[in-house]
């Protein structure tokens, strides 16, 4: 789908469709008022007859409106003007895209960017419209034999901005929006792949392809089990030893700043391509969704794609920690004591608390990059779902400025996160009689004790942890990967690169 931006009055638009907003109760937006004036009150007369109230989600498609060059006008209900916020704006865009796609409008000029969203500028409105449009049109049908497509799908969308001064920021918004949307799609595609296809080797192949596509700035190295053994990554290796699929760690390095003192930002993604729970096996109900236990790695992959596509002037390293947790004669057991790459020992009390055992070795491994900051992304704990539900990602950090940056990026992008504490009191729950620590700390504060466990391996750099167990995928009828927190991380990196969304 093609996007562009221009500045022009509605009466001069010659398009298949013009999209404008209507507020409750039956109040036209400024552009809709202009069209009403041109058409000698045609639109307002329809509203007076009760054709459209302006409630959120309502639509009215008008054909051959008098004195208007475009074939059709789509009126979209936007609710009460004062109540229009970021969430409702995205819902209005989503409804617009679905209606245009369903009614065969192959192209449209959208004036919804005129809507006032408190604290948001035209760059934000255009970029969010692009991201929302791509999200709305997303489908995962690679493995279906019968693919259903609209007869006349929407192919072109033009966003109107008030004056020519906003054209540059509008074009940048489209550029950024398309790159982020492609990153989200890449993460969702990886997450939705079945575990018999998407294993650690598949993740590694995707990482290599990324380096092939962006060879100017990206190199990929894949570290196998033999090299992990030589590095002392015994905790990571233990998790995968019950599987026939080799554990592989893919390291994607993007260099956008050649300065010698430009330290990299490191992103670490948990990549459990299937998590049965191991010997501490999970219940069978919903176990199919454990293919989503690699959504952290999928998100990191997507973000690395976005960074390379936009050629951001920063250095970023993405690590995909590929692994599979299976029961079997070679599987690790409750009661085992593992020696991590850091030299610290861990008593395994539950083999289903495996993500932290993989991540702890990767967090030690990335010390060699002397990072500016390290952010790990993981579907880590069911406890985080209990704490925050499915709407907000859990955030923990050992560095307040980094945490504040991530929270700000989450608010800017609409991909929200909430900070949880990392108090010393919680560390006591990880005490073990037989090792330096246990891999679980009991039910109370389970998301926090998991973060506390990881914090013991991050003392040499600024670190943040994103627990996406509640936000990485949806269950039920709309089952599928969400691509989160790609938008959050993308905004964080755009901010670091100096693109903070100002006009």
From Swiss-Prot:
Family per similarity comment: Belongs to the peptidase M17 family.
Species whose genome carries this gene: Shigella boydii serotype 18 (strain CDC 3083-94 / BS512)
Listed EC numbers: 3.4.11.1, 3.4.11.10
Gene3D superfamilies reported for this sequence: Leucine Aminopeptidase, subunit E, domain 1, Zn peptidases
GO molecular function, one term: manganese ion binding
Gene this protein is translated from: pepA
Function: Presumably involved in the processing and regular turnover of intracellular proteins. Catalyzes the removal of unsubstituted N-terminal amino acids from various peptides.
Catalytic activity: Release of an N-terminal amino acid, Xaa-|-Yaa-, in which Xaa is preferably Leu, but may be other amino acids including Pro although not Arg or Lys, and Yaa may be Pro. Amino acid amides and methyl esters are also readily hydrolyzed, but rates on arylamides are exceedingly low; Release of an N-terminal amino acid, preferentially leucine, but not glutamic or aspartic acids
A biological process from GO: proteolysis
InterPro entries registered for this protein in UniProt: Leucine_aapep/pepB, Macro_dom-like, Peptidase_M17_C, Peptidase_M17_leu_NH2_pept, Peptidase_M17_N
Cell location: Cytoplasm
Positions contributing to Mn(2+) 2 binding: 270, 275, 293, 354
Cystine bridges: none
NCBIfam families recorded: PRK00913.1-1, PRK00913.1-2, PRK00913.1-4
Active-site positions on this chain: 282, 356
Short name of one Pfam family: Peptidase_M17
GO cellular component labels: cytoplasm
CDD domains the UniProt entry points to: Peptidase_M17
Protein name in the entry: Probable cytosol aminopeptidase
Binding site for Mn(2+) 1: 275, 352, 354
């Amino acid at each position: 789908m093609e996007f562009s931006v221009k500045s022009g009055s509605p009466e001069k638009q010659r398009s298949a469709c013009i999209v404008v907003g209507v507020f409750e109760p039956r109040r036209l937006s400024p552009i809709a008022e202009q069209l009403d004036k041109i058409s000698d009150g045609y639109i307002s007369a329809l509203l007076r007859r009760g054709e459209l109230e302006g409630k959120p989600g309502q639509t009215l498609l008008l054909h051959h409106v008098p004195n208007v060059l475009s074939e059709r006008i789509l009126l979209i209900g936007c609710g009460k003007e004062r109540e229009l916020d970021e969430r409702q704006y995205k819902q209005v865009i989503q409804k617009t895209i679905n209606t245009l796609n369903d009614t065969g409008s192959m192209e449209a000029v959208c004036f919804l960017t005129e809507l006032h969203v408190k604290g948001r500028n035209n760059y934000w409105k255009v970029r969010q419209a692009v991201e929302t449009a791509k999200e709305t049109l997303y489908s995962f049908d690679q493995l279906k034999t019968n693919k259903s497509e609209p007869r006349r799908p929407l192919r072109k969308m033009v966003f109107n901005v008030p004056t020519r001064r906003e054209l540059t920021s509008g074009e940048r918004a489209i550029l950024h929006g398309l790159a982020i949307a492609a990153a989200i799609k890449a993460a969702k595609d990886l997450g939705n792949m079945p575990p018999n296809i998407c294993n650690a080797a598949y993740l590694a192949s995707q990482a290599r392809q990324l380096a092939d596509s962006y060879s100017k700035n990206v190199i990929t190295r894949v570290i196998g089990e033999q090299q992990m053994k030589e590095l002392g990554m015994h905790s990571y290796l233990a998790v995968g030893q019950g599987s026939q699929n080799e554990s592989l760690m893919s390291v994607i390095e993007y260099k956008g700043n050649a300065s010698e003192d430009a330290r990299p930002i490191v992103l670490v993604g948990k990549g459990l391509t299937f998590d049965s729970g191991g010997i501490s096996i999970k219940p069978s109900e919903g176990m199919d969704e454990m293919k989503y236990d690699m959504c952290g790695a999928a998100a990191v992959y997507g973000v690395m794609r976005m960074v390379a596509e936009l050629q951001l002037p920063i250095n970023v390293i993405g690590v995909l920690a590929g692994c599979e947790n299976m029961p079997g004669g070679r599987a690790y057991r409750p009661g085992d004591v593992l020696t991590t790459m850091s030299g610290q020992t861990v008593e395994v009390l539950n083999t289903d608390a495996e993500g932290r055992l993989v991540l702890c070795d990767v967090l030690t491994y990335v010390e060699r990059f002397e990072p500016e900051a390290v952010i790990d992304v993981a579907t880590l704990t069911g406890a985080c779902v209990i704490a925050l539900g499915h709407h907000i990602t859990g955030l923990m950090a050992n560095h307040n400025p980094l945490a504040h940056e991530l929270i700000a990026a989450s608010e800017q992008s609409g991909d929200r996160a909430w900070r949880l504490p990392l108090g010393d009191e919680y560390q006591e729950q990880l005490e073990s009689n037989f090792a330096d620590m246990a891999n679980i700390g009991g039910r109370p504060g389970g998301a926090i004790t998991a973060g506390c466990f990881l914090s013991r391996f991050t003392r040499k750099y600024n670190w943040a942890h994103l627990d996406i167990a509640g936000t990485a995928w949806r269950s039920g009828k709309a089952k599928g990967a969400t691509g989160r927190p790609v938008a959050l991380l993308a905004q964080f990196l755009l901010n670091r690169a100096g693109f903070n969304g100002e006009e």
